[in-house]
């Protein structure tokens, strides 16, 4: 039962729910939409980094190497790796007095 369709009223014995007819198609649709929204929100929180990276960069994994000779591919890989190696060794040390 959806929380949106329940009405709690204080009576002598405590709190009870007086719910409208649950076979109403609008109530069923609202319940399904609410459950789907909750599931999607949980998945978004769990996989936020993966999803945002996928949307930002798309499905591309790098430049296409189709039709490029293997020797040129290897040369390109070495250039990319050397560029990464240079970046990894470049740090700035700051000393506070």
From Swiss-Prot:
The record marks 37 as: Essential for channel activity, possibly by being protonated during channel activation, and by forming the channel gate and the selective filter. The modification Phosphoserine is found at residues 64, 82. One of its GO terms (molecular function) is proton transmembrane transporter activity. One of its GO terms (biological process) is symbiont-mediated suppression of host autophagy. It is a single-pass type III membrane protein. InterPro entries: Flu_M2. Residues 44-97 are intravirion. It is found in: Virion membrane; Host apical cell membrane. Residues 1-22 are virion surface. Keywords: Disulfide bond, Host cell membrane, Host membrane, Host-virus interaction, Hydrogen ion transport, Inhibition of host autophagy by virus, Ion channel, Ion transport, Lipoprotein, Membrane, Palmitate, Phosphoprotein, Signal-anchor, Transmembrane, Transmembrane helix, Transport, Viral ion channel, Virion. Residues 59-83 are annotated as: Disordered. Cytoplasmic tail plays an important role in virion assembly and morphogenesis. This is Matrix protein 2.
């Amino acid at each position: 039962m959806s929380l949106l369709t329940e009405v709690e009223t204080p009576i002598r014995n405590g709190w009870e729910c007086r719910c409208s007819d649950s076979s109403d198609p609008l109530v069923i649709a609202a319940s399904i939409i609410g459950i789907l929204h909750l599931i999607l929100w949980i998945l978004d929180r769990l996989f936020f980094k993966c999803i945002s990276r996928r949307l930002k960069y798309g499905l591309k994994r790098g430049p296409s190497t189709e039709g490029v000779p293997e020797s040129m591919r290897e040369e390109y890989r070495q250039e990319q790796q050397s560029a990464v190696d240079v970046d990894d060794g470049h740090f700035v040390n700051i000393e506070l007095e």
